[in-house]
Amino acid sequence: MIKIILAQPRGFCAGVIRAIEIVDQALDRVGAPVYVRHEIVHNRHVVDTLKAKGAVFVEELSEVPPGEVTVFSAHGVARTVQKEAEERGLPVVDATCPLVNKVHAQGRRYLSHGRTLILIGHAGHPEIEGTLGQIDGPVHLVGSAEQVDSLDIPSDTPVAFITQTTLSVDDTRSVIAALRKKFTDVIGPDTSDICYATQNRQAAVRDLCKQSDLILVVGSPNSSNSNRLREIGLEEGLPSYLIADGSEIDPVWFEGINTVGLTAGASAPEELVQSVITAIRALGPVTVEQLDGVEEKIAFRLPPTLRHLKARNAAHNNLDNKTAASEEADSLSNDTEQEA
């Protein structure tokens, strides 16, 4: 008999739910195709489901035909991308997570106060590329305490830091500690820039590890937050695997295993978790229980540009992208509200 213990919380966060809903509603209002720059979230199942509905995923705006509705992914984009869309007159709906937008605003504010800005994150991640491109000024990217030590910046320089939202909480704390050790004047948000969902899921996996012999994380290989969950299991000394769904289960993993801890990254839908449970059931008898944990009631408002898409479709007029972008900026403070 294998016991499966489910982490709580797990799976979709508010930013992912919002991003998927934006694409769904855009398709409902204007019909296919709707173009999406980059994967809307890092999960192949989600992307394939939206493709089947008529979403077309591209990496560059040059791949978008003139006049076609375009959605920016939850990870955010550089200002140059926004400008290119405006110059081409593309109707844009920005699905950037409000918590990522918050990081952009913090970075700009720190620079405006004359501080040297340090961004903690993983080079090459779409969120990092977007953040670097949203801040008009020099930004020093570091991903580890060792990289902090190699920064060629005088120790008495006033510095500020911001962070990628999907980092390991513990790793980020070590980088922040290195910054405070190297510089005499450091300000920043501690780990509060790491989003609530990332922190909650990491804490839940740590609790899961205390009761499990094996950790399974449902998520895609390019999902930063999913990889961090697997790393926590490994750090706790448990065999830990990142899998897309139940089809990737290997029976060998369960030899001598009594209790399996099961969780999912913030971009993985619950149906994939259930597919893993089904696959384990095929190996023999199982019981399933769920840990007590944080109940997430956060939701983010959809951007007002979706309403413009509906009006544009009804009147057969072109969306004024400049006006939409202005309204989006004006509503940023409202978009970032966390609602129960």
Swiss-Prot record:
Transmembrane segments: none annotated. [4Fe-4S] cluster binds at residues 13, 97, 195. Its cofactor is [4Fe-4S] cluster. Its EC number is 1.17.7.4. The active site is at residue 127. Gene3D superfamilies: 3.40.50.11270, 4-hydroxy-3-methylbut-2-enyl diphosphate reductase, catalytic domain. Pathway: Isoprenoid biosynthesis; dimethylallyl diphosphate biosynthesis; dimethylallyl diphosphate from (2E)-4-hydroxy-3-methylbutenyl diphosphate: step 1/1; Isoprenoid biosynthesis; isopentenyl diphosphate biosynthesis via DXP pathway; isopentenyl diphosphate from 1-deoxy-D-xylulose 5-phosphate: step 6/6. Residues 317-340 are annotated as: Disordered. Isopentenyl diphosphate binds at residues 42, 75, 125, 223-225, 267. Belongs to the IspH family. This is 4-hydroxy-3-methylbut-2-enyl diphosphate reductase. It comes from Zymomonas mobilis subsp. mobilis (strain ATCC 31821 / ZM4 / CP4).
